[in-house]
Amino acid sequence: GTIVFTPPPHQETKKYMDELIAYMNDTKDGVNPLIKAAIIHSQFESIHPFDNGNGRVGRLLISLYLYKAEVINCPFFYMSEAISQDKRVYYNMLTSSRTGSYTDWITFFLKKCVVQARSHISYIDSLNNLYERTKRTLQNTISTPKFDQILECLFTHPVLNGGFLADQLGISNAQARRYLDALEGSGILQGDDRKRGRTYYFVDLLDLARRA
């Protein structure tokens, strides 16, 4: 196929990476962090320091830098979904940025930040709705001082069995199995077909996680 990009010679990789890291750590340059994240991503992809995985690491850098710059309060802003919707445009914009024309690339990047942010908000809303629905169903299913612990366990461990739940709650295996059977009966969990040592799945949460 046609070669669309050739990274700099490997002998220069360290120099360019050192310069990029210094730019990332410069907190007094007055550049808006979102614009700076766009430049950082473009520069990293141009340096292309690894044999493979540069795209994944470059997208991860966006999240880590925005977290470092306190634009987001946790380093979980992954751009892959938004970028994949216009992958050809993404590569074209990166190519134009390598000639020093950053305006189109930054504009594209900022628009994709909006798309990704809206997607994350939608996911969080769906997760909150699932939490409230599950809480209501659980309240109508079991009455126990362990209620909050069971609810937390479901959302932190959507695949579980009786032994695990017993350990988490500090209860007997028999009591844990009774809870799990009740949760299966209410539709919160789905158990496998085994008669003993069954594994239970919080399918609604697992499905939501796959769409994230």
Regions found by a protein language model. Give the residues of each.
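FIC/Doc superfamily catalytic core
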Residues: 1-212
